[in-house]
């Protein structure tokens, strides 16, 4: 049975997501991606010191480096938001209430710590590869347990891979969390097209079926011929 979608939550997150999108946090495209030739193993991942590859289908290491100037510019633009008039009703029937959005903007401009999040992201192995003409960014963490099951996890809308950071260690290292080695997974978490550090589609058509095919290409490119998939919300 499909999980019932909370449309009120979606409306709220949608507006919040669009606000973030217009500010283009850190201009994700400025993150630096480097490429290397993958050495075939059970799972194909770049090896340190490997030769650079010009093949867009190669699995390339991806390094996050958001300039401080971009963060400062983002905060300034959030602070300079010109707000519309207050809604004419006391409930959310006309959308997210103005006071809620203003409080969110205040938090983003003054309290939100991108560097803290960036540090968590940098602690994980990031990669990028081109699939169907689009750069796809993903996290790939292999379990040290034998016979771990490959798992690809897809975030929802609006959302990002940050939602899945907390599940990586319990899935890849279950014995450290009171579970059995037989519960282990090799975890792959891609950013959907147009999200995070993945490329932005320039045409329509990137629906669930096309993304599903792209994810299959990704898993096979990583050397996984047998895997399971998980998604939440619209993931």
Residue spans for each PLM region:
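N-terminal secretory signal peptides and thylakoid transit peptides that target proteins
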Residues: 2-20
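Catalytic cores of eukaryotic secretory-pathway lumenal/extracellular enzymes that build
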Residues: 20-21, 108-112, 117-235
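An N-terminal hydrophobic leader/cap segment in hydrolases
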Residues: 79-126
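C-terminal segment of N-terminal export signals and the immediately downstream linker at the start
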Residues: 26-67
